[in-house]
UniProtKB/Swiss-Prot annotation:
It comes from the Bacteria. It comes from Campylobacter hominis (strain ATCC BAA-381 / DSM 21671 / CCUG 45161 / LMG 19568 / NCTC 13146 / CH001A). InterPro entries: Ribosomal_bS21 (IPR001911), Ribosomal_bS21_CS (IPR018278), Ribosomal_bS21_sf (IPR038380). Keywords: Ribonucleoprotein, Ribosomal protein. This is Small ribosomal subunit protein bS21. One of its GO terms (molecular function) is structural constituent of ribosome.
Amino acid sequence: MPGIKVYPNESFDEAYRRFKKQTDRNLVVTEVSARRFFEPMTEIRKKQKISARKKMLKRLYMLRRYESKL
């Protein structure tokens, strides 16, 4: 779980910004929203398939973009 130490000369806004950044990096909010409701295995596999396809298309796009510059 993320935690920060607030320095004496640091404002609340700065400390809050650091805390938000740390929670975003640790994917705390994403994990909480994912665990909020039960997800059947079929839904998990469906999401994994979609993300794998996105990754593959992104790699293909980058490869074609790189090849066109040669």
